[in-house]
Regions:
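Extracellular-facing segments of soluble proteins and assemblies that are Gly/Ser/Thr-biased and enriched
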Residues: 97, 102-195
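Conserved "cap/hinge" positions at secondary-structure junctions
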Residues: 211-212, 237-239
Length: 276
């Protein structure tokens, strides 16, 4: 497995970055193929909120709306690791059909970074696309798009910019910028960039994170409430080994003031609720 670089922290730490709750606790594979009728029913029911709950209204064009409307692979699609091997057959949640999860360094924090950065790039909010490496160096997309490139001395881990090429705001160049961020950022650095949520409710786009080595993170991609005002949330994640982005097939009741949250692959503790 290719090692993600944490600067100047031990480089191999990211091999443990999202490897919680294993030892047989992962969702079991469903070894069957859905019929056309079953697939149609499953598509209608997939990701539907629990009885008595309705999805909250989201303004078109917002980050929340972007996350709610992520393109999904067909019902019953397999969930794949970055190398093409199958993690879960006929995944009962949803597999996001997006340009992520095909590179070895595209892990849990990177999934959150990618979704946030992609929305900002699509809405041309280029100046807001910036992420820190683990040593605190700020990688600015605007400088990258203008032709500057980031250089790293791997003996001292000093980073600097230099003007190396012409300006280019294309997706190809944007993706190359993200590949570098994925290599040198992680849950430890991402957590420091986010604001702690002090209230009792989350918004779509909020992040659940325990930064560290190991660490893990998931992102809120939808929200529903009942007549009592009680909220439930839909969560998505990347993982280690790198994989496609998955949306869990369950809604979570989350109160950030309760300092413990159990998800299928990770127990979050402390001030885990954050916001961009």
């Amino acid at each position: 497995m290719k090692t993600k670089h944490t600067i100047p922290i031990i480089l191999s730490a990211f091999l443990l970055s999202c490897t919680g709750k294993t030892n047989g606790q992962s969702q079991q594979s469903v070894e069957k193929t859905l019929t056309v009728e079953q697939a149609a029913t499953a598509k209608k029911q997939r990701l539907a909120p629990p009885p008595g709950y309705k999805k909250v209204k989201l303004t078109e064009g917002t980050f929340g709306s972007f996350l709610r409307n992520l393109p999904l692979k067909p019902v019953g699609s397999d969930l794949h690791y970055y190398n093409g091997s199958i993690k879960r057959r006929n995944y009962t949640g949803a597999v996001v059909d997006i340009d992520f999860g095909h590179g070895e360094v595209e892990q849990c924090a990177d999934a959150v970074i990618y979704l946030r950065a992609l929305w900002l790039w699509q809405t041309k909010q280029y100046d807001k696309i910036h992420f820190n490496f683990t040593n605190g160096f700020r990688a600015d997309y605007t400088r990258w798009a203008k032709g500057e490139r980031i250089h790293i001395d791997k003996k001292t881990w000093r980073c600097w910019y230099s003007k190396d090429t012409a300006a280019d705001y294309s997706y190809k160049t944007f993706r190359k910028y993200l590949n570098l961020v994925f290599t040198y950022a992680g849950t430890a650095s991402l957590e420091k960039e986010l604001t702690t949520i002090t209230g009792k409710e989350l918004q779509v786009g909020d992040v659940i994170i325990n930064g560290g080595h190991p660490g893990h993170t998931v992102i809120v991609v939808d929200k529903a409430v009942n007549k009592k005002g009680e909220a439930v949330y839909l969560l998505a994640q990347g993982y280690t080994p790198a994989q496609e982005i998955e949306i869990f097939n369950q809604w979570f009741s989350i109160n950030p003031q309760i300092k413990y949250l159990d998800t299928p692959d990770w127990y979050f503790r402390g001030n885990y609720a954050k916001r961009f």
